Amino acid sequence: MLEAPSYLVSRDLPSSCEEESKWIYNAHCVLQLSLRKRLLDDTDVEGSSAKKMLRVDHGSRGESDKITDSLQLAKTYQSSNQSQQGGGGDQQSSPVTRLDQNALLNCLAHCSLSDFGSIASTNRTFRSLIKDSELYRLRRAKGIVEHWIYFSCRLLEWEAYDPNGDRWLRVPKMTFNECFMCSDKESLAVGTELLVFGKEIMSHVIYRYSILTNTWTSGMQMNVPRCLFGSASLGEIAVIAGGCDPRGRILSSAELYNSETGEWTVIPSMNKARKMCSSVFMDGNFYCIGGIGEGNSKMLLCGEVYDLKKKTWTLIPNMLPERSSGGGGDQAKEIAAATAASEAPPLVAVVKDELYAANYAQQEVKKYDKRLNVWNKVGNLPERASSMNGWGMAFRACGDQLVVVGGPRAIGGGFIEINACVPSEGTQLHWRVLASKPSGNFVYNCAVMGC
């Protein structure tokens, strides 16, 4: 996943430069990227025409001082390394080295993920720091988050798009297994990991992709293996709720996953058992919406919210957004409930702690009024977003944007398209195409990683 344009790292240094100068140059590049990232973050950019290159303002004394200090740190770091190597000492035990690495981590935390590949290719130290989970913990602590959109349009194959760098990312192919390939799969991005849940011949299985190692691994297990559940992540943690166990029983149980420790913890169960539900985090709480309950094929109209601090679930009646084209109000909800078995789980996403839902039948997007427990139309879906009863199209949040991943129906090929819009109070949604490429146009799974 550490990919970058080669021109960012192939710049020639003056012939008189020694290793110390290279260190200063490398640190200077990191600071330049860091400052450019901050300038881009502080600039109001809208629409596809806003992709610009901004130059760092060296007239700002505060930032210039930071560059000078960091260049001096880089010089000290190199001098420390040379003295350790010359004296035969243990480099790892040097307190100065550790201090300098912390300073470099702080600089790297402000750089864009799009630039990490270039930075990693400059030397082993930067490469090691970028593969260190501590860097991403530091970014979260500073409130620095960028998002990558992962999706699968071909079985066992994943690809990703980086909106900030406007580039497609290669993801290694998953290990081939016919049973897993044909099973229902759920996906979840949490921390620096992409989790894909499915079933092999004898048991459920979880495949984990790490952007730090660019590899897939398996072997991790929940306390209660399941499928067809609702899930959502918040930083380094995720919650899964409901679903079906290996015997097909619909579950009310829930678990919390910590990506930093790799541990699954059982949390209190929901009030109602449900499968094929959808989940989001909003206002720091976990919501589970809709789903099919025990003993029937009708969609549950209620939702539930889990308070992570109080560790309690609260039922929310009639929270399900309208899902049919058969009119409004309770009648539409009853029609939607009756046809639940053939429909995808509710298409919901949260942007700036506001909940949105996509109605594939009416091609509409609605916003949830938390105070009144009602849904109000705020716009339409992109024109070329198609689905089969909600299947094959992804509706997700990507930072401050809503994104729709999908493509028009086509015979013998097609393309995938990523549309995005920034929802704003009192205005209709204005969609724009972020990216498109030749691909299968049925989205099997999709997850947005923020790190």
From Swiss-Prot:
Highest taxon above the source species: Eukaryota
GO cellular component: nucleus
Annotated Kelch repeat ranges: 137-188, 193-236, 237-284, 286-333, 349-395
SMART domains the UniProt entry points to: Kelch (SM00612)
All copies of domain F-box, residue ranges: 93-139
Annotated Pfam families: F-box, Kelch_1
SUPFAM superfamilies named among the record's database cross-references: F-box domain, Kelch motif
Keyword Repeat assigned: yes
Keywords, in A-Z order: Kelch repeat, Repeat
InterPro entries: F-box-like_dom_sf (IPR036047), F-box/Kelch-repeat (IPR052439), F-box_dom (IPR001810), Kelch-typ_b-propeller (IPR015915), Kelch_1 (IPR006652)
PANTHER family, per the entry: F-BOX_KELCH-REPEAT PROTEIN (PTHR46122:SF9), GALACTOSE OXIDASE/KELCH REPEAT PROTEIN-RELATED (PTHR46122)
Name under which the protein is recorded: F-box/kelch-repeat protein At1g74510
